[in-house]
UniProtKB/Swiss-Prot annotation:
One of its GO terms (biological process) is regulation of translation. Additional factor that functions in concert with eIF-2 and the initiator tRNA in directing the ribosome to the proper start site of translation. The keyword Protein biosynthesis applies. Pfam families: SUI1. It comes from the Eukaryota. GO terms for molecular function: ribosomal small subunit binding; RNA binding; translation initiation factor activity. This is Protein translation factor SUI1. Keywords: Protein biosynthesis, Translation regulation. InterPro entries: SUI1, SUI1_dom_sf, SUI1_euk. One of its GO terms (cellular component) is eukaryotic 43S preinitiation complex.
Length: 108
């Protein structure tokens, strides 16, 4: 006779099927710099889009400075000065036709 309910179970363990779905998301994060200064980062934009052109349009439309950072794990990341989370989300939905369910906004 085997007792089944004494097995250890970790509810926070990765199930394995999350890997494919998490790579499809676009993550918009805000980071605190010094004082009241903030930095908005956008990662996970699909490869079919030209990130340099997107960055150029974002900088012009929002009136802020920005640059691209190459990361080994995350790939190409767009950085914008200031809290641009809502504007970037609206831009991705309207201009690039990315569904809202594929965009994750992080921050305080």
């Amino acid at each position: 006779m085997s007792i089944e309910n004494l097995k250890s179970f970790d509810p926070f363990a990765d199930t394995g099927d999350d890997e494919a779905s998490s790579s499809n998301y676009i993550h918009i994060r805000i980071q605190q710099r010094n004082g009241r200064k903030t930095l908005t980062t956008v990662q996970g934009i699909p490869e079919e889009y030209d990130l340099k052109r997107i960055l150029k349009v974002l900088r012009k439309d929002f009136g802020c400075n920005g640059n691209m950072v190459k990361d080994d794990e995350m790939g190409e990341i767009i950085q914008l000065q200031g809290d641009q989370r809502a504007k970037v989300c609206e831009f991705l939905i309207t201009q690039l036709a990315i569904p809202k369910k594929n965009i994750k906004i992080h921050g305080f």
